[in-house]
From Swiss-Prot:
Complex formation: Homodimer.
Record's protein name: Acetylornithine aminotransferase
Protein's cellular compartments: Cytoplasm
Record pathway: Amino-acid biosynthesis; L-arginine biosynthesis; N(2)-acetyl-L-ornithine from L-glutamate: step 4/4
Family according to the record: Belongs to the class-III pyridoxal-phosphate-dependent aminotransferase family. ArgD subfamily.
Gene Ontology MF terms in the entry: identical protein binding; N2-acetyl-L-ornithine:2-oxoglutarate 5-aminotransferase activity; pyridoxal phosphate binding
InterPro entries: AcOrn/SuccOrn_fam, Aminotrans_3, Aminotrans_3_PPA_site, Class-III_PLP-dep_AT, PyrdxlP-dep_Trfase, PyrdxlP-dep_Trfase_major, PyrdxlP-dep_Trfase_small
Group of enzyme by EC: transferase
UniProt: pyridoxal 5'-phosphate binding residues: 95-96, 127, 214-217, 272
Gene: argD
Organism expressing this protein natively: Nitrosomonas europaea (strain ATCC 19718 / CIP 103999 / KCTC 2705 / NBRC 14298)
Assigned EC number: 2.6.1.11
Length: 393
């Protein structure tokens, strides 16, 4: 009997080794990983440059308290602010913690303006984490069920709907911020219209609100740029990161700029482990690998190849399928729930995920090569075809 709490419906496999885009189970079977730990291992499993850096750091210094200056933390803050155009960084251990920091920042920003009940606009079908604040911000009733009462201070609107935001702006004087995923992951791999972020930026500027972008899943090169918001040339007031930042070593970050950068003062927020030397060394090395190996360009090249190949191989089903993607973030929406494809893919030694009940989600490592990508497309296309032939008439 396992003594691990029953919080996951785990698949019947135990992985013991990883290299690049491959994993091996405890029986010696090899699997092609098209999920990369849900967008965590962006440079692949156990990249040799990362392994060397971590071994060196473990033998030098693992942790000190944030009551002291931490050299690698300062370096990482410099790097992330330089890449993003934001000004300050707070480090924590996960995406949920990063979003919790953003929510606290927005509330404090509101109180500093004399707003007694600061309220944040959030989106339907969003996912921001499982702490109480981020769970409340998340737009998924199944995830929230059983954890009521949820927190106050949030107003929900449809994603990619500027008119809905304008209606809220006209009727609620306690709004202080908008929090959304630049591209939605858990909600079904959804991408907004080209002018959406510009419209949100304009509304925020008109009302003195903060625009806060959750790039926990879509950031750090996955879409072909360092951050997904850079496709829209819109500057947020705050942005959250995690997942791919540490290549598996837990680290999250909340970045802020402009009027949001100086909101937090000593004592307002903290994290015991956040930004420790080991985690920051992992993040710095990850950024080096992405940059030096041209992985953002590779994400675009291989991502486009996969998107086009899926379209070609699944052409017979084009009337019932929706294929969405940017870089190494790809979703294939089926007309019916398809969660059974995940264990079927596992039998074929390919790791994929189904989100929002009907969307096959692929989040490969940014350094996946064409031959490996072609294998993923071949296996997944065959699975989808098999599934649809038995479900769709």
């Amino acid at each position: 009997m396992s003594h691990v709490m029953n919080t996951y419906a785990r698949l019947p496999v135990t992985f013991v080794k990883g290299e690049g885009v491959w994993l091996w189970d405890d029986q010696g079977n090899r699997y092609l990983d098209a999920l990369s730990g849900i967008a965590v291992c962006g440079v692949g499993h156990c990249h040799p440059v990362l392994v060397k850096a971590l071994c060196e750091q473990v033998s030098t210094l693992i942790h000190t308290s944030n009551v002291y200056h931490i050299q690698h933390q300062e370096r990482l803050a410099d790097r992330l602010t330089s890449l993003s155009g934001l000004e300050k960084a707070f480090f924590c251990n996960s995406g949920a913690e990063a979003n919790e920091a953003a929510i606290k920042l927005a509330r404090l920003y509101g109180h500093n303006q004399g707003i007694n009940l600061p309220t944040i606009i959030v989106m339907e079908r969003s996912f921001h984490g499982r702490t109480m604040a981020t769970l409340t911000a998340t737009g998924n009733r199944k995830t929230q069920a059983g954890f009521e009462p949820l927190l106050t201070g949030f107003v929900r609107v449809p994603y990619d709907d500027l008119e809905a935001v304008n209606k809220v702006a006209a009727n609620n004087r306690e709004i202080v911020a908008i929090l959304l995923e630049t591209y939605q992951g858990e909600g079904g791999v959804n991408f907004p219209q080209a002018n959406y972020l510009q419209g949100l930026r304009r509304i925020c500027d008109q009302n003195g609100w903060l625009l806060m972008l959750d790039e926990v899943q879509c950031g750090l090169g996955r879409t072909g740029k360092w951050f997904a918001f850079q496709h829209s040339e819109v500057m947020p007031d705050a942005m959250t990161l995690a997942k791919g930042l540490g290549s598996g070593v837990p680290i999250g970050a909340c970045l802020a700029g402009g009027k949001a950068a100086e909101v937090f003062k000593p004592g307002n927020h903290a994290s015991t482990f956040g930004g420790n030397p080991l985690a920051c060394r992992a993040a710095l090395t990850t950024l080096d690998i992405i940059e030096q190996e041209g992985l953002m360009d590779n994400a675009v090249t291989i991502g486009n190849f996969m998107w086009e190949e899926f379209g070609r191989r699944l052409q017979a089903w084009q009337d019932v399928l929706k294929i969405r993607g940017q870089g190494m973030m790809i979703g294939i929406e089926l007309p019916v729930p398809c969660s059974e494809l995940v264990p079927e893919a596992l039998k074929r030694r390919v790791l994929v995920n189904v989100t929002s009940e009907k969307v096959v989600r692929l989040l490969p490592a940014l350094n996946m090569q064409k031959a490996e990508a072609e294998q993923v497309v071949t296996e997944v296309s065959a699975l989808i075809t098999w599934f649809l032939e038995s479900r769709v008439k």
